[in-house]
Each structure stands twice: as structure tokens, then as C-alpha cells.
Amino acid sequence: MAFDPAANAGPPLDEIQWHTPPQFEAGIHSNSILYYFAQSPFYDKTSNNEVVFQQGLNNQAMSQYLATRELFESRLKEMSGLEFIVAQEPAETGPGMGTGVWVINKQTRRKRPPTNPARPEDGPPDEIIVHSVYFVVGENIYMAPTLADVLSSRIGAIATAITKTIPLVDEVSDWAPAVGRRYITPAQPSAGAGAASGTTNYTASRTATPLPDGLPSTATTNKPGAKAGGGTTTNDPLLDSLLMEEALLTHERYGTEYMDENPITGKPGDFHLTSTGRKTQTKSALTLKEAAAALPALNTKGLGAAGSNPLAKGAAAAAAANANAVTGKETKSPKTPGGGGPPKPKRRKSKNVITTPGAA
């Protein structure tokens, strides 16, 4: 059977914790941290670290680079390629005390051509590409997760929590045409007799829904232990059917009536606008129509002559009034014989004699 690397690769590197008893003097310190990391599965033997290590073991002139970490890393910085280098040392929290956390970067170094060949040290800095980060805590080595892995894990946890809450919300909510939205209070295990009786607690919606006449309100039917007719109220399919029928009848009868921004009180068929005091004129309009239909018809047959037709007399009087208004003449009312007082005597005009003084 052929060897399958994918099947024998084991768990992902960012999900394992590796440690081994250190085989160095004084344990893990600045000069032995890279050698200790080289024993872990995170290490890559094709890196420049392995090249410098093998050269120091087999070449006497290169063995000096294995003495300290500073010399070892200085040799790595002169080369191009993949390398493991200490990015952060343990922070000092006190005299001779550190956190014990080492940060190691797996990176690729690329050399840039110097601008002045005579002084290559003054050239541009090397190009560094970091592939992964590892941290050593005590004797344990971990691989730091990437930002994409952290976000994916958090989003997955949030989605799982939301998926679990949706069925719970569906279980505690209930809706009926007459009473609206209701929420069931989950029964507590230590509720005692209330939980043992099997009654269900409901929390009604904030907006009260008007109920048909003869039906109990939501405040009394939804409370545990509330009695209607001498017993505890429960969900009744027959009552639900009756409420549904009442709702449909109310909609068919008063479905054309709408509510506006003004607060409306009353019941279907008799709404009142509380802000202005106005009322719907539906009933008054119907009353006027019925009164107009109940008036008797006026019989005008046989009233052809003006003397016997009161309507003709009225028309003649109106025509005479209009004629007087046009000509400016007024019609004098006839004198009633014997109805007035004695006739006034006529006033005679006196003639005044004007005398002219004669000449002296």
C-alpha cells in the first residue's frame, strides 16, 4: 500500500502542544532556545538554521557561530532564505525575573542590492516575509493561530448559539387572532404546586387587543390560577375556533373602518375621535336619509288656477316684489276702513306780507 502523507499527517500544527524534557545545561535559556525549538515538529530542516548548525558541527571555522544566539542569528542575517529567529524575548518583570514566554518567527529573508557597493552595510534593509509565529511557554511550544482562524472560530460559535436559541423562542411564543401575541413563561423546576398542576403562564403583548363581547380579557385568561366560571383557564380548541369566527365576522362587518393618527375610542361601528371630540356621522347620515324617505309626496294635481293654487299665489307675489325692486316704486298698503284714527286736519299755509319801506 502506498504511503499517504495526508492520512498520516496527524492533527493540524496549530492544534497541538509539544514539549520534551530539555537536554541542555541550565534548561531553556537564550543560547539554547533555538536548539530546543529544532526538536519540535514545527521545525523545518530545509531552513538556514539547519545549514548553519551542520556547518558548525563539521567545519571548525564555523563552530564559533554555535556558541551564542547572537552569533548564530548574525550568521542567519547574512543569508537569504527560510529561517527561524527569536522575535521577542521574555520581558523582565523584576530583577532576574521574566515571563518565560519566547516568540519565534518563521520567515523568509530576501536580500536587496546595495546602492553603494563600497559600503554594503548602508544598503536598503532586507525584505522579511513572516509565515507563522510560535511561542514557547516554559517547556510547551504552541503555534499562534492566524486572524482568519480566530474570526472563523468566533463566527462559528455565534452561529451555533443563534441556531440553538431560535427553537427556544418558537416554543415560548404563541399567537391568537383575538388576543394577539403571547409569551409563555418557562416553568421553573422549583415552582412547586404551580409547576405540578400543569398550568401555563402567559405574558400578554404590550398593546391590548379589543375582545368581542362576552369574552374574558387577556389580563384574566393569561394569569396562572385565574378563574373564569369557577375553574382554571386553559387552552381550549373550541374557544380558539369561536374567537377566530368572531374575528372574521368583525372584519367583514367593520373592515372598511380605519384608524388615523388621532386616538380612537369605542368599539367597531361606534368609534370616537378623542382629540377633537368629533364623531363619525354614519348613524346621523342614515337617520337623515330615512327621514327624507318618510316625508309624504306633495299632490299638485287640480291646482291649475292661480287663485286656487297657493304655489301660484306665492309665485305672483314674488314677481311683483321683483318688479317693484327694479322700478323703484313701492306698493302702498291698502287702508283699512275704520281701522285707523281720525283724519289729520290740513295745515294752511300763511302768506307773509313783505313791506318795503318807502322813501323818506
Swiss-Prot record:
One of its GO terms (molecular function) is transcription coactivator activity. It is found in: Nucleus. InterPro entries: Mediator_Med6, Mediator_Med6_sf. GO terms for biological process: regulation of transcription by RNA polymerase II. One of its GO terms (cellular component) is mediator complex. Pfam families: Med6 (PF04934). Residues 186-238, 316-360 are annotated as: Disordered. Signal peptide: none annotated. Keywords: Activator, Nucleus, Transcription, Transcription regulation. Residues 190-205, 316-325 have a biased composition (Low complexity). Component of the Mediator complex, a coactivator involved in the regulated transcription of nearly all RNA polymerase II-dependent genes. Mediator functions as a bridge to convey information from gene-specific regulatory proteins to the basal RNA polymerase II transcription machinery. Mediator is recruited to promoters by direct interactions with regulatory proteins and serves as a scaffold for the assembly of a functional preinitiation complex with RNA polymerase II and the general transcription factors. Component of the Mediator complex. Belongs to the Mediator complex subunit 6 family. This is Mediator of RNA polymerase II transcription subunit 6. It comes from Neurospora crassa (strain ATCC 24698 / 74-OR23-1A / CBS 708.71 / DSM 1257 / FGSC 987). The gene is med-6.
